[in-house]
Curated annotation (Swiss-Prot):
Gene, per the UniProt record: whiA
Protein name, UniProt field: Probable cell division protein WhiA
Entry remark concerning the domains of this protein: DNA binding is primarily driven by the H-T-H domain, but requires full-length protein for maximum affinity.
Pfam families associated with the record: HTH_WhiA, LAGLIDADG_WhiA, WhiA_N
One MF annotation (Gene Ontology) recorded for this entry: DNA binding
Observed phenotype of the null mutant: Cells lacking this gene do not sporulate; instead of aerial hyphae of unicellular spores, long slightly coiled unseptated stalks form.
GO terms (BP aspect): cell division; regulation of sporulation
Function as written in the Swiss-Prot or TrEMBL entry: Involved in cell division and chromosome segregation. Involved in sporulation. May coordinate the cessation of aerial hyphae growth and subsequent chromosome segregation and/or septation. Required for expression of the ParB partioning protein during sporogenesis. Activates its own transcription and represses WhiB. Binds with low affinity to its own promoter and to the Parp2 sporulation-specific promoter. Also binds directly to the RNA polymerase sigma factor WhiG, leading to inhibition of WhiG-dependent transcription in a dose-dependent manner.
Record organism: Streptomyces coelicolor (strain ATCC BAA-471 / A3(2) / M145)
Family to which this protein belongs: Belongs to the WhiA family.
Reported induction: Transcribed both as part of an operon and from its own specific promoter during sporulation. Transcription is stimulated by WhiG.
Gene3D superfamilies assigned: Homing endonucleases (3.10.28.10)
Cell wall biogenesis/degradation among keywords: no
Transmembrane segments annotated in the record for this chain: none
Xref: InterPro entries: Homing_endonucl (IPR027434), Sporu_reg_WhiA_N_dom (IPR018478), Sporulation_regulator_WhiA (IPR003802), Sporulation_regulator_WhiA_C (IPR023054), WhiA_LAGLIDADG_dom (IPR039518)
């Protein structure tokens, strides 16, 4: 969904000058680099979408008054898609100071500029919008869903976490294989942040996919639960049939007919539920009556086996059936 979000927010109209400044500052901080060429500062920002690059080029001119060139780099090598480089040569040193890339003495600033860090809520939103356009990604809703931004260093990461905090968004700075990242994992927080960025269509798509996944996961859990219960019930019925068979062997002819009849039903219909066994009885019985008769049959046989010193009704059961040693 990354491309959809970037496409949407790169076309978002922003009228407040402070917000446009904050967004440009963030894009240059997270996607840019400073180079010294013949003693002068040259600024470059490399982006992965043409819309974001054109937006940056326009704002640099309209807000800061500097011209820039847009260079398209075709896919090749490790680059899977085209890359778009916005380069400012004339006035690069002035733009670097205006956007907070360097301080008044020309020393690099590693985080976000003070006017963004201490600005209004809209500036925090704009900073996040710029950072996401520069190096953001959004994964599909799921167990490992996340919205994250790759940062040029820990100072920029902490500044972005602070901006998220001002928006009441829980974000964490992490270093993964030597790369600083800011990550938002909570599904509700991701939806709230996308709304703050102005990606309203993307929020709807995100929430729809998230809901669909949750419904599917719930259905799978219920299906697994039902399957497990069915398997457990089937094993229990088979185990009960094996115990009844052993009980009738132990008691031989010395067993009341109504108990023997219930036992024979269990043996003849090993997969049937107690309710189904009751319906098959003549006359029909309730499931509690069937269960009671089978319990009494087993108890009588186990007592006789104990008196005779022989194996009881559990003798015919395997390990799994012993674990499910129920009537049915």
């Amino acid at each position: 969904m990354t491309a959809a979000v970037k496409s949407e927010i790169s076309q978002l109209p922003v009228t407040r000058t402070c917000c446009r400044k904050a967004e440009v500052s963030a894009v240059l901080r997270f996607a840019g680099g400073l180079h010294l060429v013949s003693g002068r500062i040259v600024i470059e920002a490399e982006l992965d979408t043409g819309n974001a690059a054109r937006r940056l080029k326009r704002d640099i001119l309209e807000i800061f008054g500097h011209s820039s060139e847009l260079i398209v780099m075709a896919p090749g090598g490790l680059r899977r898609g085209s890359r778009f480089v916005v380069r400012v040569v004339a006035g690069g040193d002035q733009l670097a100071r205006q956007t907070g890339l360097v301080d008044g003495r020309g020393r690099p600033i590693r985080g976000l500029p003070p006017q963004v860090v201490s600005g209004a809520t809209c500036d925090a939103e704009a900073a996040w919008r710029g950072a996401f356009l520069a190096h953001g990604s959004l994964t599909e809703p799921g167990r490992s869903s996340s919205l994250e931004v790759t940062c040029p260093g820990p100072e920029a990461a902490l500044a972005l976490v602070g901006a998220a905090r001002r928006l009441s968004i829980p974000a964490k700075a992490r270093e993964v294989r030597g790369v600083d990242r800011v990550v938002v994992r909570d599904g509700d927080a991701i939806g709230a942040l996308l709304t703050r960025l102005g990606a309203h269509d993307s929020v709807l798509a995100w929430e729809e996919r998230r809901l669909r996944r949750e419904v599917r996961a719930t259905a799978n859990r219920l299906a697994n639960f039902d399957d497990a219960n069915l398997r457990r019930s089937a094993r229990a019925a088979v185990a009960a049939g094996a115990r009844v068979q052993r009980a009738l062997e132990i008691l031989a002819d010395d067993v009341p007919e109504h108990l023997a009849a219930a036992g024979r039903l269990r043996m003849e219909h090993k997969q049937a539920s107690l309710e189904e066994l009751g319906a098959l009885a003549d006359p029909p019985l309730t499931k509690d009556a069937v269960a009671g008769r089978i319990r009494r049959l087993l108890a009588m046989a186990d007592k006789r086996a104990s008196d005779l010193g022989i194996a009881g009704t559990d003798a015919n059961l395997g390990e799994e059936e012993l674990a499910d040693n129920l009537v049915g």
